[in-house]
Amino acid sequence: MSTIHSNEKGVLYYAVCASPPAQQAQDFVRLAKEGGWDVCILATPRATKFMNIPVLEQLSGHPVRSEYKTIGTADIWPKVTAMVIAPMTLNTTTKWAQGNADNLLLSQLCKGLGLGLPIVAAPCITDPYSRHSAFGRSLTLLRECGVHILYDPDNYPAPKVVPWEQILERLNQAAE
């Protein structure tokens, strides 16, 4: 694994859910690294099935994590300064808004809110799921908590997500 990290902007925890855009997670990692971020990748356990873990670890220089570390061991990642979650599923959206931290990814997102970190979220949800009342309420609550939501189903219907460049641009604005 590479040990060279560009971190002029800080340490970004990039969270990935199980949705088709997870297959292109390396595209966002490349952009973020080129933009000066040191990227650490979190994934839901199911999202790891969509991702090319060896490529992501090579690009980021850090292990991809989907499970908690062993109690009593040192953390293998540097301290987070900002977060992005893309693609974000209905399941993660509603659980996060409720403060449910039943996996590492959700735990870190809940912690990020508590720390007041800049967080950008880009849901990737098909139309039937987006019409569930819990989805809209959850987006409203997350916005009220300060999360920068990028959701444009008219221009980027699932399985598309808002372009990686727009996500990075919003992250850079939020982190200023």
Where are these regions (language model features)?
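A cross-family phosphate/adenosyl-ligand binding-site feature
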Residues: 1-176
